[in-house]
Curated annotation (Swiss-Prot):
The gene is ATG4. One of its GO terms (biological process) is mitophagy. The active site is at 144 (nucleophile), 299, 301. Belongs to the peptidase C54 family. It holds the Pfam family Peptidase_C54. The lineage of its organism: Eukaryota, Fungi, Dikarya, Ascomycota, Saccharomycotina. It comes from Meyerozyma guilliermondii (strain ATCC 6260 / CBS 566 / DSM 6381 / JCM 1539 / NBRC 10279 / NRRL Y-324) (Yeast). It catalyses: [protein]-C-terminal L-amino acid-glycyl-phosphatidylethanolamide + H2O = [protein]-C-terminal L-amino acid-glycine + a 1,2-diacyl-sn-glycero-3-phosphoethanolamine. One of its GO terms (cellular component) is nucleus. It is found in: Cytoplasm; Nucleus; Preautophagosomal structure. This is Probable cysteine protease ATG4. Its EC number is 3.4.22.-.
């Protein structure tokens, strides 16, 4: 079964919501006759459509530019068609149980999030999740960073020119890129993340890398993965193609610093973009484009049943967030199909303040991932979690509360 989320998430403006043009205000003495009134309405509709297509700011979606009023031959919105092509991973309920760890949060600590969510009907369809305190059968309340990371990965595979098999992202332990395996990889690592604990961007990046490496060892998954800490990209590490570059970033303290605004938009504008997993305070979102200073995103905080079909991985509905309201912690994805792509990326991002290109890495450098990169949201007192954020330094702090 497929859920239609258009009504919940649709925020794009219709022509009726756009500012009226001067032709909309026609004095009474020009409307005395019915024929002239109809002619005026016809002319108004023509000029309004023309005005909207000229004055509306262009919409940029993963390196391609569209006008908000653009329509295809069938009259469908070109922007919404492009949005629907993106892969959207969201909360799921009723999946294969993930056993609670004795040192981790309990499933019932997320009951409030399970009940008060954006798809209450899904909650009642999976009522057992409200009484099982031994197993996680939904990621509502804690899995949004994993879902947006899955979105980056799925869209990266698509951007690399390969068909995306959504079964690889199914919520079972046998699926290569499932939530179950994201949790397992992190749990088996020295970080020892537990089910129900939140992933930071650095941890999400490393988990994607390990899952892709494991999958490549047994089956032909097209992507290799490089994690580029601090936005540093080294020529001598770009060896195989296609390659997914993951950049765990922190671009400010409470909000994205103004100095990075244009550079951040550029990461969504280049044709190599795979999107950004990040968000606003208290949630992680999948950003795939922008219009003006408004970032366009797909929201993972919409629970769907695990049995929902292929259509549930797409939606033509999206929301907007002004860049000034964006949380500074995020993970950006860039896909390089070949060396020409890499050369083009370097040319397009000359002067970018986020990514930096180097000929070779100093191999005395190393990446240290802190245990605090995982935050336990199973605590009843969330203020303790919020207080912990202040103790993190700018390098290891990748904190968003789900």
């Amino acid at each position: 079964m497929t859920w239609d989320t258009k009504n919940q998430f649709e925020t794009t403006k219709t022509s009726q919501e756009l500012p009226a043009t001067s032709q909309d205000h026609i004095s009474d003495n020009k409307m005395n006759s019915e024929p002239s009134h109809r002619l005026s309405q016809f002319w108004s509709s023509l000029t309004r459509s023309s005005s909207e297509s000229i004055t509306a700011e262009p919409v940029v979606i993963l390196g391609h530019t569209y006008r908000e009023g653009d329509r295809d031959r069938e009259g469908d919105s070109e922007v919404q068609k492009q949005v629907k092509k993106r892969y959207w991973m969201s909360y799921r309920s009723g999946f294969e149980p993930i056993k609670k760890h004795e040192d981790g949060p309990s499933p019932l600590s997320f009951v409030q999030s399970m009940i008060f969510n954006k798809n209450v009907g899904n909650t009642f369809a999976n009522i057992h999740s409200l009484v099982d305190n031994d197993n996680f059968t939904t990621d509502v309340g804690w899995g949004c960073m994993i879902r947006t990371s899955q979105s980056v990965l799925a869209n990266a595979i698509d951007r690399a020119g390969y068909e995306v098999d959504v079964e690889l992202f199914a919520d079972t332990s046998s699926a290569a890129f499932s939530l179950h395996n994201f949790v397992k990889v992190a749990s088996d690592s020295p970080l020892r993340v537990r089910p129900g604990q939140w992933f930071g961007p650095s941890a999400a990046s490393l988990s994607i890398k390990r899952l892709c490496e494991a999958r490549n060892s047994s089956t032909n998954v097209p992507l290799s993965v490089l994690v580029c800490e601090s936005g540093d990209i080294y020529d001598d590490q770009i060896q195989t193609f296609p390659v997914l570059l993951l950049l765990p970033l922190r671009l400010g303290i409470d909000h994205v610093n103004n100095v990075y605004h244009s550079s951040l938009l550029q990461l969504l504008e280049v044709p190599q973009s795979a999107g950004i997993a990040g968000g606003k305070p208290s949630s992680s979102l999948y950003f795939f484009g922008y219009q003006g200073t408004s970032l366009l995103y797909l929201d993972p905080h919409y629970p769907q049943n695990v049995s929902a079909g292929v259509g549930s991985y797409h939606s033509s509905s999206y929301q907007k967030l002004d860049i000034s309201d964006m949380d500074p912690s995020m993970m950006a994805g860039i896909v390089l199909k070949n060396n020409e792509d890499y050369t083009d990326l370097k040319r397009r991002t000359t002067g970018n303040k986020i990514i930096h290109f180097h000929e070779a890495r100093n191999y005395n450098d190393y990446v240290e991932v802190e245990r605090e990169d995982f935050i336990d949201l199973g605590q009843n007192n969330r203020s303790a979690t919020a207080g912990a954020e202040a103790d993190f330094d700018s390098e290891s702090s990748m904190v968003i509360v789900d």
